[in-house]
């Protein structure tokens, strides 16, 4: 948060920095993800520090800030490879708007920034897990490029964005970029162009997974800074009663949004979750392999119960396969192929099981229940009536 305020203050004023920080701290998506064990919050923090480092380097042209900007930009992509378009566009925006192109190309500090940005991500994503990187790009990006030709994709994206981050504020922020100085304008245009390219590169998850939009939180917040600074400059010239009134309105808005987020967090009680998964892990057979229709692609039982469960696709997964153009064969053939080599079938998602009637019928008709407990059923695939 400190870097958001400092960056907002640096590109506008302290008033703009306060508004950018308020949005960053209180927008519901940011609050919810900050309480998650996912690395996305760290990725966003590094992105903000990288942007701040670039602005400081652009102003001071020191080797220290070149190293800070390059390292944090590289670490942003290392933590999560997805925001690569945002980082690249941000770099281009600030570099192009800072000096003449010829001077920029001849500056060794520029090449240091670019080298540090590329080094660690290239080692990890190309050398260490190159095959996995290529598979991810095929599955979630190039394999879904046809979605970009459908108008419904853009409608879904904008609607999803609006529900998460308030589209009207984003439009105000984009319009407010024209109020910035050249270098700050280049930075913010780079961030916005990068976010758009980021969404186009991930044309399915950008409107189905809320945390994929997390990089937009600081972008929207910082974009609001110039318009907010202009507005607050007018407010300070008002009479005291009007100033008090507007401050009260702002505090009320923040309090209202904070209460909604708090209610959402407290409305779902996960207190008993860990114990349930621990008990399940203890109850499952120690010998034998397990495939299952289970929560979070097996992450909960793996984390709390220390049991690895191979994943049976959910309805959303099958819909994703259709978008990729992958045709599904006959159910019996699919079941035999997926379940081959596994000894048990675990079910914890009973709603999903009801939505897959052929799977439900196969399990209950042909396999005995090996274990049953609170929140789960375990079928013995070794003793099926067809074997």
Q: What spans do the regions from the language model cover?
A:
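Periplasmic/luminal catalytic loop of GT-C fold multi-pass membrane glycosyltransferases
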Residues: 168-169, 319-384
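Membrane-interface transmembrane helices that cradle and orient dolichyl/undecaprenyl
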Residues: 9-15, 50-66, 76, 180
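Transmembrane alpha-helical segments
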Residues: 227-232, 241-270, 310-312
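Short helix- or helix-capping micro-motifs
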Residues: 20-25, 73, 77, 91
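Transmembrane-lumen/periplasm boundary regions of multi-pass, lipid-linked membrane glycan transferases
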Residues: 75, 86-184, 195-210, 252, ...
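Transmembrane-helix signature of polytopic, membrane-embedded enzymes
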Residues: 4-26, 45, 63-64, 189-190, ...
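Short acidic/glycine- and proline-prone juxtamembrane loop motifs at membrane-interface regions
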Residues: 35-42
